[in-house]
A protein has these predicted regions:
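Substrate/cofactor-recognition hotspot
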Residues: 417
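Membrane-embedded transmembrane alpha-helical bundles that form the catalytic cores
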Residues: 1-414, 423, 427-462
C-alpha cells in the first residue's frame, strides 16, 4: 500500500488511527498495541501477501536469537548465527542474480539465472534487526516482549523504506501508555507534514520523473542541454521523492505520537561531501558508522586505516542500494570523495563557501548519474554529452523531451528553492496551529489529491 494512494489516505489511515486511539481511550493498551501490529502486517501484505510469511519468520528468528544473546551464554556464537542468516537472506533475494551473472561472465558458464522478486523493505527490516542483535550483544537491550519487538520491526510508517529505526529510541515510546491517547497537536503537525510530503512526491518528484525518464531512455541521442537537464532533474527527483517519503513517515509517526528519526537535513546545502553525508539518508549513515565503520576500527588505527574503513563502508552502502556495478561504483566514488575531503581538511586551506557548495553539489550530481543509469555505457554517454561544448547551440527540432527549455529553467529554480528554503522538519519546530499552517496544509493536500490520478512507487522501494 502506498502513502500516496486514495485507499491509504481515506481508508487505511483513518481506520487504523480511530481503532488505535479507541482502545487507548478505554485504557486497553495491549489491545491498542496488538491492533497496531496487525494493521502494520496488513499494510505490508497488501502490496504482496507472498512475503508476509518471510517477514514474520525473520521477526521470530531474530527475536529468538536476540533473547539467546541476552542470556550471555555463547552470545558471540548466537550473534554470528543471527547476522549470518540475515546476510544470507538479504543476499539470496537481492544479490543471487547479480552474482550468477558475474560467474557466467567470468567463468564462461551458462547458468540459468532465476527470477527472484525482491521482498518489499527487506533491506530496511534486515538492517533494523541486525542492529538489534548487535545491541543485544553489547548488553543494550532489556528483554522486550515479543509483541513489542514485532511492533518495533513492523510499525507501518517506517516498514517499507525507512527511516531505519533503533530500539533504544523507539521501544520506550511504544511502552509509553500516554502515546495510545490522541494528541491533537501531534495530529495537526503530522497532517501538515504529511501534506507537504505528499505535495513533494506527487506534484514535484513525479512530474520531474516524466522528463528525466525520457532523457535517460534516449541517452545516446542527447545534446548538451538535455544531458544537463537529465542530471539536474534526477538529482532533484531523487531528493524530492525520498525526502517526501521520509517526511510522510515521520508525519504518520507523529499522528501515532511517535518520534521517528529525521532522515534529511537539506543535503544539497552541504558545503562538503562530509557535510553531505551528515545530511543525506542520515539513519543509514548512523547505521554504517555504528555497526560497520567503528567496528572495523574507525579512525583509531592511523590515517591509512581510517581511509580504508571509509572507502569500504561506502562500497557497502553502494552495494546495499542495489545489485549492480553502477551502485558499487557510486559508493566507491563517494568513498574516494570522502577520502579527498578528509585529506584536504588536513591542509588547513579554506575555500570560499560558494566554491565549496558548487564543488560538492557538482560531485554529488555527477555520482547520481551512475546511481540512476542502467549500465556504465549509459552513464558515460550522458556525462560525455554534458561536456560536449561544441553542441551548446541546439536547434529546436533536436530536442528529444517535450518542453525541455522550461524543464531546464524549472530545474534551476528548484535548485534555488533547495538552497534557500528551510527543511520542513526544521519549519515544524516553530509549528503553531494557525491559519497560515491550515492554509499550507489544505492547499498542498488539495493540489496533491487533484493530481493523484495514478499511483507511482517511491524510488527507494526498489532498495
Amino acid at each position: 500500500m502506498l502513502f500516496n494512494s486514495y485507499e491509504f489516505i481515506f481508508l487505511y489511515l483513518p481506520i487504523v488511527l480511530a481503532i488505535y486511539f479507541f482502545w487507548g481511550s478505554r485504557k486497553k493498551y495491549e489491545f491498542a498495541t496488538t491492533w497496531l501490529v496487525l494493521s502494520s502486517i496488513f499494510f505490508y501484505g497488501y502490496w504482496d501477501c507472498r512475503y508476509v510469511a518471510l517477514l514474520l519468520a525473520s521477526i521470530c528468528f531474530n527475536y529468538i536469537i536476540g533473547r539467546m544473546i541476552e542470556r550471555k551464554s555463547r552470545k558471540r556464537i548466537f550473534l554470528i548465527i543471527g547476522l549470518a542468516v540475515n546476510i544470507l537472506l538479504l543476499g539470496y533475494y537481492k544479490y543471487t542474480g547479480f552474482f550468477m551473472e558475474q560467474i557466467n561472465a567470468t567463468m564462461g558458464t551458462d547458468m540459468i539465472i532465476p527470477h527472484i522478486v525482491l521482498p518489499l523493505g527487506i533491506s530496511f527490516f534486515t538492517f533494523t534487526q541486525s542492529a538489534y542483535l548487535i545491541d543485544a550483544y553489547r548488553g543494550e537491550t532489556t528483554g522486550y516482549s515479543f509483541k513489542t519487538y514485532c511492533l518495533f520491526v513492523t510499525v507501518f510508517p517506517h516498514l517499507i523504506a525507512g527511516p531505519i529505526i533503533y530500539h533504544k529510541d523507539m521501544i520506550p515510546q511504544f511502552m509509553n501508555k500516554a502515546n495510545c491517547h490522541i494528541n491533537y497537536d501531534n495530529m495537526a503537525m503530522g497532517l501538515a507534514l504529511f501534506s507537504v510530503g505528499l505535495f513533494k512526491k506527487i506534484v514535484i518528484a513525479d512530474n520531474i520523473s516524466i522528463w528525466v525518464n525520457s532523457i535517460f531512455n534516449h541517452y545516446d541521442q542527447l545534446n548538451f542541454l538535455e544531458a544537463w537537464a537529465g542530471a539536474l532533474g534526477y538529482t532533484f527527483q531523487l531528493y524530492f521523492d525520498f525526502s517526501a517519503y521520509s517526511e510522510m513517515a515521520i508525519a504518520l509517526g507523529l499522528m501515532l505520537n511517535l518520534r521517528l528519526p529525521v532522515n534529511f537535513n537539506s543535503p544539497y546545502q552541504a558545503l562538503s561531501i562530509i557535510d553531505f553525508w551528515r545530511r543525506w539518508h542520515m539513519t543509514l549513515g548512523t547505521w554504517v558508522k555504528s555497526y560497520l565503520y567503528i567496528p572495523m576500527g574507525g579512525n583509531r588505527h592511523g590515517e591509512f586505516a581510517k581511509m580504508r574503513n571509509l572507502f569500504v563502508s561506502m562500497l557497502i552502502i553502494g552495494l546495499w542500494h542495489g545489485a549492480g556495478w553502477t551502485f558499487v561504483f557510486w559508493g566507491g566514488m563517494h568513498g574516494l570523495l570522502l577520502m579527498i575531503n578528509h585529506q584536504w581538511r588536513r591542509t588547513g586551506i579554506a575555500l570560499p563557501k560558494p566554491i565549496c557548495w558548487a564543488l560538492t553539489f557538482f560531485s554529488v550530481m555527477l555520482a547520481w548519474i551512475f546511481f540512476r543509469a542502467e549500465n556504465f555505457a549509459q552513464a558515460l554517454q550522458i556525462i560525455h554529452s554534458m561536456f560536449d561544448f561544441q553542441d551548446i547551440y541546439i536547434a529546436a527540432a533536436n530536442w528529444r523531451v517535450e518542453k525541455n527549455a522550461v524543464n531546464v529553467w524549472s530545474a534551476i529554480a528548484g535548485l534555488g528553492i533547495l538552497i534557500w528554503l528551510p527543511n520542513p522538519i526544521i519549519m515544524l519546530r516553530k509549528f503553531k496551529a494557525n491559519w497560515i499552517w491550515y492554509s499550507i496544509t489544505l492547499i498542498a493536500l488539495l493540489i496533491s489529491l487533484y493530481q493523484m490520478n495514478t499511483y507511482t512507487e517511491f524510488l527507494y522501494f526498489q532498495f
